[in-house]
């Protein structure tokens, strides 16, 4: 497409000093605009991807990859379901669970999800034992009515290890004074911290047998599965439900938090589209600078035409020159984006310590720190998009240059 002569002249125009200094300024602004857009876009998408990955990982530390639960009634033969699940080589662990919404009362009230577990089996499907800041998962012994609370939940309730909390379940019971919610006093035996505010403030864990007693329940809600490859969660859970041969409900990690993952993906897409406008502005500046360059080089174009360069050759010259500006801006932006992403958390900590401010409040953004996950496909797409915009921006100025008539251009020289 580009012959050596077009490339040589295009490179010469890129390095040459312009008679009009304003053209050089606009060309530099084009490079900076494209570079800034690429840098900001790479960094922002890396942060958005980092948030997605961090939230997903922290959720899955306490949540199952997949669940199989009984439909409309407790699952009674859960031991058989766990044993059957473990025969699947794709399953790393399986454990029974009971879940119910509850209202916890300490110095204050707070709704939370209450989960009943078997301690020695829970370690196969979650990292609860490793996330305990105080206490041990072995403290959840049947009949002792101990409870593990998220650190933020305990702080809100105003309780600590050794204190008591009253748990009110959504199930009701009939008493001499009327219908009352089921309630029981538990002793706080440990505090856990995952680093995800929704869990640290919204989950309480007790022994499964204790929960069965206060709920008058002789089965479990279902079985939780941890897999070697969580991308196969739905298939594995569906296969287990079929093998159990009953009316079971199947869910996996993508469906349990579908709204959250969808909103995060949408935010990343919208942010990418909006920030692409910065690159578009740089490309628009490139159009302006190239049009002015064509006007400035009319005499040169006329001489080239009289020496035998075709209109297509003239067009290629300015396409090469403009594309090189785009390439320089894009590569500068890619380098800047990669370097900024690698050092972003360090920069934010420096800003926070210098101005004594908190840029990312934990209670707002759910997680601590600023995670980044720079994905190669994102960088490739951004690079190709910037190069495409730059190339398209050269077409109109190059077409104008090709239309210049030598006689008209040299008339007033």
From Swiss-Prot:
Keywords: Cell inner membrane, Cell membrane, Membrane, Transmembrane, Transmembrane helix, Transport. It is a multi-pass membrane protein. It comes from the Bacteria. GO terms for cellular component: plasma membrane protein complex. GO terms for biological process: lipoprotein localization to outer membrane; lipoprotein transport. The chain crosses the membrane at residues 22-42, 269-289, 322-342, 379-399. Its main location: membrane. InterPro entries: ABC3_permease_C, Lipoprotein-release_system, LolCE_TM, MacB_PCD. It is found in: Cell inner membrane. Part of an ATP-dependent transport system responsible for the release of lipoproteins targeted to the outer membrane from the inner membrane. Such a release is dependent of the sorting-signal (absence of an Asp at position 2 of the mature lipoprotein) and of LolA. Belongs to the ABC-4 integral membrane protein family. LolC/E subfamily. NCBIfam families: lolCE. This is Lipoprotein-releasing system transmembrane protein LolC.
């Amino acid at each position: 497409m580009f012959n050596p002569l077009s490339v040589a002249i295009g490179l010469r125009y890129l390095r040459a000093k312009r008679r009009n200094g304003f053209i050089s300024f606009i060309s530099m602004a084009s490079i900076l605009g494209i570079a800034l857009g690429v840098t900001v876009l790479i960094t922002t998408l890396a942060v958005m991807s980092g948030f997605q990955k961090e939230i997903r990982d922290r959720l899955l530390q306490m949540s199952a990859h997949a669940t199989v639960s009984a439909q409309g009634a407790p699952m009674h033969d859960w031991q058989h379901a766990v044993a059957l699940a473990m025969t699947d080589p794709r399953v790393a662990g399986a454990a029974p669970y009971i879940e119910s919404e509850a209202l916890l009362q300490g110095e204050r009230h707070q709704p939370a999800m209450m989960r009943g577990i078997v301690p020695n089996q829970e370690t196969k499907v979650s990292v609860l034992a490793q996330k305990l800041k105080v206490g041990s998962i072995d403290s959840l012994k049947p009949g002792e009515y101990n409870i593990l609370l998220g650190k933020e939940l305990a702080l809100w309730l105003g309780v600590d290890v050794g204190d008591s909390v009253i748990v009110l379940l959504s199930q009701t019971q009939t008493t001499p004074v009327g219908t009352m919610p089921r309630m029981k006093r538990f002793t706080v035996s440990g505090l856990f911290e995952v680093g995800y505010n929704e869990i640290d403030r919204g989950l309480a864990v007790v022994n499964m047998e204790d929960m069965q007693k206060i709920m008058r329940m002789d089965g479990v809600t279902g079985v939780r599965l941890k897999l070697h490859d969580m991308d196969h969660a739905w298939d594995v859970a569906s296969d287990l439900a079929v093998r159990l041969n009953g009316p079971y409900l199947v869910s996996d990690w993508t469906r349990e938090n579908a709204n959250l993952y969808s909103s995060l993906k949408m935010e990343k897409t919208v942010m990418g589209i909006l920030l692409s406008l910065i690159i578009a502005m740089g490309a628009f500046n490139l159009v302006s600078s190239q049009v002015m360059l064509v006007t400035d080089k009319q005499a040169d174009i006329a001489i080239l035409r009289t020496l035998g360069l075709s209109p297509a050759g003239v067009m290629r010259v300015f396409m090469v020159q403009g594309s090189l500006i785009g390439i320089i801006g894009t590569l500068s932006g890619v380098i800047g984006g990669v370097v900024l992403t690698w050092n972003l958390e360090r920069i934010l900590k420096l800003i926070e310590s210098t101005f004594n401010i908190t840029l990312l409040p934990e209670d707002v953004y759910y997680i601590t720190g600023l995670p980044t996950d720079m994905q190669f496909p994102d960088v490739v797409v951004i690079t190709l998009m910037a190069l495409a915009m730059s190339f398209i921006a050269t077409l109109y100025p190059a077409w104008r240059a090709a239309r210049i008539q030598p006689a008209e251009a040299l008339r007033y020289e």
